[in-house]
Amino acid sequence: PVQNVGAYGVEIADVLTEVELYRRDTGVREWVRSADLELSYRYSNLKFTNKAVVLGIRLRLRNDGLSAPLRFGELARVLNVSVNEIEARRLATTVRAEVLRLRKKKGMVYNPDDHDTWSAGSFFTNPIVSPEVVQHVRTVVEKLHGADDAAAMPCFDASGGRKKLSAAWLIERAGYPKGYPEDGPARLSTKHTLALTNRGSATTEDLVELARTVRNGVEKTFGVSLAPEPVWVGVSL
């Protein structure tokens, strides 16, 4: 719940009811309603503070054996959900197996023998921007990569009339493909552009340098600033 994790159209906020906290300043343990955590995209009011430790959570889950509505395009496609099936659901066990398969394919399930999984998961959050910024980015993409690429740019509705862009898509269009840089101790995953990985000998400095290079390159190209998803300790970008 600290950063309201989620994937494929569902996040912890959808099922979280309460969180048990240990207040470090008072030593008090208490249960707090999820509504009091200000949950939003990859955020809660616990994220950038060390005042409390999460000891436990309570979830409200379904008991009918079915998944949440399959609204995320990639997952819906592999489960053969058509665009006409509004609020379609499938067996939860089937959906879970498919999600794990997709995550493994992207190097997001840890495997000690696969350096593409040596990461903190998605490193940058997808930027939430105004419609005007979306149009600017689309114009830049058209100049750099052509009209077809600009028309296919991923863009999703967010709260307050804003839009959510794909950080991975922007990173690749800014010139940083999967596996970048080819000989670096810290590289973008060869399976998923958003993961910054340790190839076996990377230091904190190597990771920070790569993160800064990617962030600065995207901002220079598109005027969009990418924010890191993991909380940093003792270092900043």
List the model feature ranges, each with a label:
Residues 7, 21-24, 59, 63:
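Alpha-helix capping at helix-to-loop junctions
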Residues 15-35:
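Nucleotide and nucleotide-moiety/phosphate-recognizing core
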Residues 218:
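Conserved ATP-binding N-box helix of the HATPase_c
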Residues 1-20:
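A gly/ser-rich beta-alpha-beta helix-loop segment of oxidoreductase catalytic cores
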Residues 29-205, 221, 225-237:
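Phosphate/pyrophosphate- and phosphate-bearing ligand-binding catalytic cores of soluble enzymes
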